[in-house]
Amino acid sequence: MNFLRKILFPVAFVYWIVTWMRNYFYDKQIFKSKSFDLPIIAVGNLSVGGTGKTPQIEYLIRLLQDNFKVATLSRGYKRETNGFVLANNSTTVKEIGDEPFQFFTKFPKIKVAVEANRINGITQLLKLENKPEIILLDDAFQHRKVKAGFYILLTTYSELFCDDFILPFGNLREPSSGKKRANMIIVTKCPSDISELAMSEVKKKLDVDVPVFFSKIVYDELVYSEVKPIKTAEIKLTEKTIITGIAKPFPFISHLKKENDLVLEFSDHHNFTKKEIDNIKELAKNKTIITTEKDFMRLKGSLSKEQLFYLPIKSAFLKEADVLDKIILDYVEKSSRNS
């Protein structure tokens, strides 16, 4: 805990009161939430960034897309457009943001839309001729103007929300009591060898009455480019430049880095300027450049196709994935029947 955060404690206390009152007014229906007549799953967290929302949304897409018409709705963080945008084949990453662009690129079966006003976003999606049967709301745990039918709360194993405090003293967007809105909690970025005892201790600390699942990040065995894939084990041995623009890059970097590699770290969702691209070209020269899948969406077209690669990740559950899948599918099927 640094000195600046200590002196900001009074500000955090005021922020805690404001966010608590906001939730209280929604809970008591003084502030109104809008419901929609279809299954809506909201995925989010209580803390700021880096909990692994993107691979979790992708897990849900893979689970649902073969049997349901799926749409994702995101705010479109750092995009250069306003209002509702539905992705199509001419859409660019600048128009919808890196994460939605990644969804659109990887999952051609689904609809991908962005809109900061989620009520309007859902309304526009439901006006489509081939409208979705289920909507996944990305980073929407605090977006209480919409009442989703199912809430998935994410928290990282190394930074549980129950050990944190409200901004700016800590990293929480709202008091940890917000956990009571969750229908399910997923503890992300767990070590592969986590013990049953450690899982039990985490569940006890979280102190919730909903199912708790544990997931880890799995790195692909291949790194990809617009030209050809290469084995990850092979590229680890080469001297390379690693570029990240994500919230918590250390695991990604440590998975790939060897002693002489150059690492360039940028802020989360960073929009690269021409000067920065030119600097990357100069520093990397003829070396392989490897980045995250999200950053690749923003860097491709600016760097050499032969030089630029990305390493995909997935969310994998350490146990009871079938139980989680059944809970989600049961909700969707039951909600669909009632709509």
Report each predicted region and the residues it spans:
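C-terminal accessory "lid"/substrate-recognition subdomains
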Residues: N2, L160-T288
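Short, flexible loop segments at boundaries between secondary-structure elements
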Residues: D220, S267-H270, E306-K334
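Hydrophobic residues at beta-strand termini and immediately following loops
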Residues: V43, L73, T155, S215, ...
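A transmembrane-helix-recognition feature enriched in membrane-embedded lipid enzymes
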Residues: M1-P39, Y331, S335
